[in-house]
Amino acid sequence: MDTKLLELLVCPVTKGPLVYDREKQELISRSARLAYPVRDGLPVLLESEARTLTDEELGL
């Protein structure tokens, strides 16, 4: 994931920052508790495509 692109992207739900998880190929929104997939290097920032994060994944 291009770091410059990552700096521009925000969560479509909360407008907060996203953190890239290289291992899982996801963009994480801690405030929305969602993980957006990255497919073929392209972020899919659709709420309907995101998965809900567990407390364990959020470190809670």
From Swiss-Prot:
Highest taxon listed in the record's lineage: Bacteria
Stored Gene3D superfamilies = 2.20.25.10
Q: Which InterPro entries match?
A: Trm112-like
Q: Which Pfam families match?
A: Trm112p
Gene Ontology CC: one annotated term: cytosol
- Per the database entry, which stretches of residues form a coiled coil? none
Q: Secretion signal: which residues?
A: none
Q: Which HAMAP family match?
A: UPF0434 (MF_01187)
Give the UniProt family note. Answer: Belongs to the UPF0434 family.
- Protein's name in the database: UPF0434 protein Bpro_2950
